[in-house]
């Protein structure tokens, strides 16, 4: 904590999550190739460009509102009861999203991206800044996500950037 600004960082074991999510794809050649790259901790330059191109096409280039909870449609004879609406609509607005890019000067291949966010929960809005880094540590790839209320990026952005570069 810095008084007015708060931040937290979470680390996600990418290999473990990939294995749990894709159990049914364990024999898929693309999954096997992806897991081999995660084990090796390296992606060749051609694959890197293909991956970055594919990922960056999915990143919003303009302000985008993402609903976090949507109405649920259920089967019902009464059309009035066919949709269950959430009590408050929660959204995440993505602004100034940065493209995923390689980070120079790191021990392991590292890729980073960041964005300003606006979390809205009914009448309450919380501006945030998120900075993420994917570190391809051999055998133990990790996704680090830092989130802060420092939306001006004066205090925590340099801290996040230096932390992601110094991962050993």
Predicted segment positions?
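Short linear sequence motifs
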Residues: 24, 101-104, 127, 137, ...
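Short, low-complexity, polar/charged sequence segments that are solvent-exposed and flexible
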Residues: 28-33, 83-86, 162-166
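Phenylalanine-focused residue identity feature
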Residues: 8, 31, 108-111, 134, ...
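Alpha-helix boundary/N-cap detector
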Residues: 26-29, 46, 151
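Surface-exposed amphipathic alpha-helical segments
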Residues: 138-168
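Residue-level detector of solvent-exposed, low-hydrophobicity positions
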Residues: 15, 38, 115-118, 136, ...
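N-terminal "mature-domain start" segment
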Residues: 1-19, 23-32, 89
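Signature of long, low-cysteine stretches enriched in small and polar/charged residues
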Residues: 6-7, 11, 19, 37-134
């Amino acid at each position: 904590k810095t008084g007015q600004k708060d931040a937290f960082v979470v680390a996600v074991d990418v290999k473990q999550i990939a294995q749990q999510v894709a159990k049914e794809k364990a024999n898929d050649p693309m999954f096997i190739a992806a897991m081999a790259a995660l084990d090796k901790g390296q992606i060749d330059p051609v694959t890197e460009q293909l991956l970055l191109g594919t990922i960056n096409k999915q990143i919003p280039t303009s302000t985008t509102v993402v609903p976090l909870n949507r109405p649920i449609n259920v089967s019902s004879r009464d059309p009035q009861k066919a949709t269950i609406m959430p009590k408050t609509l929660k959204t995440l607005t993505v602004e100034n999203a940065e493209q995923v890019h390689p980070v120079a000067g790191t021990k392991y291949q590292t890729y980073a991206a960041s964005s300003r966010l606006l979390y809205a929960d009914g009448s309450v809005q919380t501006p945030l800044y998120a900075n993420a880094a994917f570190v391809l540590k051999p055998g133990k790839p990790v996704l680090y996500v830092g989130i802060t209320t420092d939306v001006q990026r004066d205090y925590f952005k340099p801290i996040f950037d230096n932390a992601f570069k110094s991962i050993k």
